[in-house]
Amino acid sequence: MGVTKKPDLSDPVLRAKLAKGMGHNYYGEPAWPNDLLYIFPVVILGTIACTVGLAVLEPSMIGEPANPFATPLEILPEWYFFPVFQILRTVPNKLLGVLLMAAVPAGLLTVPFLENVNKFQNPFRRPVATTVFLIGTVVSIWLGIGAALPIDISLTLGLF
């Protein structure tokens, strides 16, 4: 569909620049003004037009209409607050629940200091950070699923 410009590698001047590692700045199509003035606005306006068109042609309700005179049996927060809601719901002392929530970022801040001698970026060569991430992910999913269940089976997820 499109035409791609390729550099002429038989040109001795270009080959000399490439040998010095200077080629990426000296051949091809410049980003200014070709991309920034012509291609990007077309893509942005096309995306906006598709979004507005879909919103006009197929309007969808966000949820059921609110009734201020009928309170639901159990009020649940948004899905991304489920783990925090589960901590506050299951811990009997609310101050302890708030401290547990504050301990999560504090614990995450200590992970780099535990592995400060390890300079690798590969997760398999950073066992402490990988273990903290995996355990945190599993606990967060476990708490999130438990928050949607009744409180008597929320900690065991109804499995035990």
UniProtKB/Swiss-Prot annotation:
CDD domains: cytochrome_b_C. It comes from the Eukaryota. GO terms for biological process: photosynthetic electron transport chain. GO terms for cellular component: chloroplast thylakoid membrane. Keywords: Chloroplast, Electron transport, Membrane, Photosynthesis, Plastid, Thylakoid, Transmembrane, Transmembrane helix, Transport. Component of the cytochrome b6-f complex, which mediates electron transfer between photosystem II (PSII) and photosystem I (PSI), cyclic electron flow around PSI, and state transitions. This is Cytochrome b6-f complex subunit 4. The gene is petD.
